[in-house]
Amino acid sequence: MTISVRPAKESDAANLISHRRALMAETTFMLYEQGELDKTEEDERARIRRLAARGNSTVLVAEDGQLLVGNLTAVGGEVRRLRHSATLALGVARSHWGRGIGSQLLSAALTWSVGAGLHRLELTVHTSNLQALGLYLRYGFQVEGVRRHSLLVDGRYVDEYLMSRLQDG
């Protein structure tokens, strides 16, 4: 298995939508529930263009051959006081869990973020998602706090950790 990680292109729009919809069906760790993502290919192409045009945002994809198996989105702050930071969201297809794809995406995002001049990266993760929590801790993210009952998943309130990583510069 050779995994490649690269910035998303507009031509990835359909595959990104399919991948994100599959993630929503496979796990409750994603923000959206199954059926909630109603984006068209043009919507996704516009999102990729919009984020690529901003110096503090990006979309990365991980591919196993021609199959899109992971993605990471970094959305940078829009107002001056937040432009030094970005919020990350990462998803890997269940079929490829435990193969280091999350690590590859996060490593690529960290490299990109230094070049983009970002000082702060942040994210949230379900407190029960121990695999993802371990990944983020290994890459220098720290827990800043708990967002209590921040999500309602299958009729139950779920806590999330708010995590961040500060970079020199």
How should these model regions be labeled?
Residues P7, M24, F29, G35-S95, ...:
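Acetyl-CoA-dependent GNAT
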Residues N15-S18, A46, Q104, A108, ...:
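Alpha-helical elements of Rossmann-like donor-binding domains used by nucleotide-donor carbohydrate transfer enzymes
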Residues L82, R120-H126, L137, Q142-V158:
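Conserved catalytic-core motifs of GNAT/GCN5-like acyltransferases
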